[in-house]
């Protein structure tokens, strides 16, 4: 009687018990007899160790790919929620610290032509016959998180992400090149004068 009983508790199952269970088919009730931890189920296969339980193993030593490491959180991240635009400093910090992870990539953000730099420095607009110089263009604060996500994806070295960023930057440069001509061609004063000169229903004589 004693020899026919199955061992319970923390006793490891023998090879004969495992082979017998494999032959009869795995069931939850039989696995419960072999599992030292109640309430946790995992199959037992010959020649392999049992997988670690996710409830008790919170950290695993996985092989990390150096090419896919994300940048660490810097001190500039702490200023996101207090209204300070840290986009320029964050981009410089990421490019200086993680530029070696993209040996085959193209940093279109660093490629600024003389025409782009000149258009971003000062943009002259013609309003009422006078020129007003606007300060340097900066990304909107609402785009700060989007810029950070784009930089993190770019540092991963993914070819489609690099291609999308390259196309986006080229389109942005093209828009900045044409911005000055578009602003100069827009004359709001002439449109206002034309609207005031048009006859209205109040000025028409009554019949």
Curated annotation (Swiss-Prot):
UniProt xrefs under InterPro entries: Corona_nucI (IPR004876), N2-like_embe-CoV (IPR044311)
Keywords: Virion
Record-level GO cellular component terms: virion component
Protein location: Virion
Primary location recorded for the protein, binned into one broad class: virion
Role: Structural protein that is not essential for the viral replication either in tissue culture or in its natural host.
Family according to the record: Belongs to the coronavirus I protein family.
Extra information: The gene encoding this protein is included within the N gene (alternative ORF).
Protein name: Protein I
């Amino acid at each position: 009687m004693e020899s026919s009983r199955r061992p319970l508790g923390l006793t490891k199952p023998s090879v004969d018990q495992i082979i017998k269970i494999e032959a009869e088919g795995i069931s939850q009730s039989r696995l419960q007899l072999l599992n030292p931890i109640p309430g946790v189920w995992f199959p037992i296969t010959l020649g392999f160790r049992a997988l670690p339980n996710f409830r008790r193993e919170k950290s695993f030593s996985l092989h990390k790919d150096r090419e896919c490491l994300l940048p660490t959180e810097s001190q500039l991240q702490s200023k996101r929620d207090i209204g300070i635009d840290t986009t320029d400093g964050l981009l410089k910090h990421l490019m200086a610290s993680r530029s070696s992870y993209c040996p085959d990539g193209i940093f279109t953000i660093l490629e600024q032509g003389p025409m782009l730099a000149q258009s971003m420095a000062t943009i002259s607009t013609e309003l009422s016959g006078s020129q007003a110089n606007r300060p340097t263009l900066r990304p909107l604060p609402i785009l700060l998180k989007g810029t950070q996500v784009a930089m993190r994806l770019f540092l991963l070295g993914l070819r489609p992400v690099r291609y999308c960023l390259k196309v986006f930057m080229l389109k942005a440069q093209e828009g900045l090149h044409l911005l000055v001509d578009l602003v100069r061609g827009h004359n709001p004063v002439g449109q206002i004068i034309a609207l005031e000169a048009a006859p209205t229903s109040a000025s028409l004589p009554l019949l």
